Amino acid sequence: MSTPLRIVKIYLSIVLLVSAVPNAFGRELPTAQPSRVGMSTERLQRLTDHMHQAVEEGVMVGGLGLIARNGRVVYRETYGQSDREAAKPMAMDNIFRIYSMSKPITSVAVMMLYEEGRFFLNDPIARYIPELANLVVATSTADGQTTAVSDGTTSSTLGEGDESKQGQTRKPLRQPTIRDLLSHVAGFTYGFFGNTEVDKQYRAEQLMQSDDTLEQFVTQLGEIPLQYDPGTRWHYSVSVDIQGRLVEAVAGMRFGEFLETRLFEPLDMKDTSFIVPQDKLDRLAQIYSPEGTQEGSS
């Protein structure tokens, strides 16, 4: 079974949402006076004043803060508004889109399966995702430069004047591993941060705008060259999306189902999900750009 890609884009934008109250991460923590745990009430007040000033100056529309020390909450404040247009004040139980901070959650799911002995980190990903068994590397990389094999471990660059290399591919020095996925060194890209030949192909295939399942996504991805040899360069990429498919393949269930049953429910994370239920939409905080314009939708 597989999860629709448009739902699991928790790695890029709108999807995984989490309440900012303590019980979003388990049972509510006890409170304590700051001085009881070695913190300054006066300095915490400075934080509150600074955040309210940021709202007044238009640096942000709203937010909330929570600080715990030694297992006790010593600071819990709200600032500004959750919806400026509706004049709704920020509340401690507002729900927020966490965007790429969902990446650590995905990696936790992967490492849970690793701890159960379901795979080794140095296993090639194709062992579990056969759609990625025949990956090749593009000879054209950044801004017209090309790559060529120089030895058994690295790749070198040739000048952009070598037109004969444009659009060609070759076998990778080795296949990407699960460890590579977790480290963003598997050779994949995202498609919208650069203008390489591989980035252009991601965009042409509309790889990140698809409603496909994760299984369909990796099938499509397997037809596009890697941008770099695995293990040779760090590059922010779709590696975490592939991790989601790895979880599905190893666990035998949809990625969202795995997170819900193995992670969110055991931790009592009642307000964490891929989609905000209708009865919680009024708690969803709006998003604003640095220029102050509202972005996204519920």
What is the meaning of each model-derived region?
Residues M1-I7:
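N-terminal secretory signal peptides that target proteins for export/translocation
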Residues D83, P130-S298:
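Short, surface-exposed loop or secondary-structure junction motifs
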Residues I125:
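Acidic-enriched catalytic cores of C-N bond-cleaving enzymes acting on peptides and small amides
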Residues R27-I98, F120, N134-D143:
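Short, conserved catalytic-motif segment at the N-terminal edge
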Residues P104-R118:
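Hydrophobic or amphipathic alpha-helical targeting/insertion segments
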Residues V37-L44, E57-V61, I95-S102, R118, ...:
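Solvent-exposed, acidic/flexible segments
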Residues K9-N23:
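Bacterial N-terminal signal peptides
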